[in-house]
Amino acid sequence: MDVSAALSSDYSSGTPSPVAADADDGSSAYMTVSSAPPKRRAGRTKFKETRHPVFKGVRRRNPGRWVCEVREPHGKQRIWLGTFETAEMAARAHDVAALALRGRAACLNFADSPRRLRVPPIGASHDDIRRAAAEAAEAFRPPPDESNAATEVAAAASGATNSNAEQFASHPYYEVMDDGLDLGMQGYLDMAQGMLIDPPPMAGDPAVGSGEDDNDGEVQLWSY
C-alpha cells in the first residue's frame, strides 16, 4: 500500500491529520515560543531589525507587510510561505508548515494551532504546505480597522472637492466672465489700431477737391 498516496487522499478529502488528532486528546503539549524560546545565533546582523521580536519564522519585509519561511528538518532548503498583512497571519502560516514538517517536534507560535488549523500530513509536498499556510493565514485576517475607514473617508472627501472644482470651472457664469475679459482686451486693441489711421476729411477743408475728379463728389452743405 502506498502510504504517501493514502495520506494525500486523506488530506484532499478533508480527513483530520494525525497531528490534529493527537492534539485533541491532550496527551502531550507542543513546544511554543513562550515555553521554549528559540536560540538566536550570534553574529547575524542582517535580520536583527526585521525579525519579529516574539513570533518564530516571521520577518518584516515592508511597512505593514510580514513574510514567513521555514527550513526543512534535515536540510538547508527553505520553504517560502508568502507575504502577509499582519504578523499573526504569518505566524499562523509558520505553525502549519512547522507541524507538517516536524510533527511533535515543532516549536509553534500559538499553542492552539494544532487544534484550530488544518494541517497537511507529514511528508506533504511543498505546494500542499504553502496552500495550507495560506488558508490558515486567511482564516486569521483581521477585519478592517478604524484607520482604514478614516483613510477611505479622507479619499472620498478629496474626490468630492476635486469634483466641485471641476463643476465650478465649467459653469456658464465663468465662461461669460472669460468672454467679457476677452472683449475688453479686444476693445483696447481696436483703440490702439484706430490711433494709427488718419481721420476722414472734413467738408470745407482746402485740401479737399484739389484733384480734378474730386469736384464731382463734393457735397454742398450751404446754398444761397
From Swiss-Prot:
The keyword Transcription regulation applies. Keywords: Activator, DNA-binding, Nucleus, Stress response, Transcription, Transcription regulation. One of its GO terms (molecular function) is DNA-binding transcription factor activity. SUPFAM superfamilies: DNA-binding domain. InterPro entries: AP2/ERF_dom, AP2/ERF_dom_sf, DNA-bd_dom_sf, DRE1A-I. The keyword Transcription applies. Residues 1-46, 139-161, 200-224 are annotated as: Disordered. It holds the Pfam family AP2. It is found in: Nucleus. CDD domains: AP2 (cd00018). Residues 1-16 have a biased composition (Polar residues). Transcriptional activator that binds specifically to the DNA sequence 5'-[AG]CCGAC-3'. Binding to the C-repeat/DRE element mediates high salinity- and dehydration-inducible transcription. Belongs to the AP2/ERF transcription factor family. ERF subfamily. This is Dehydration-responsive element-binding protein 1G. It comes from Oryza sativa subsp. japonica.
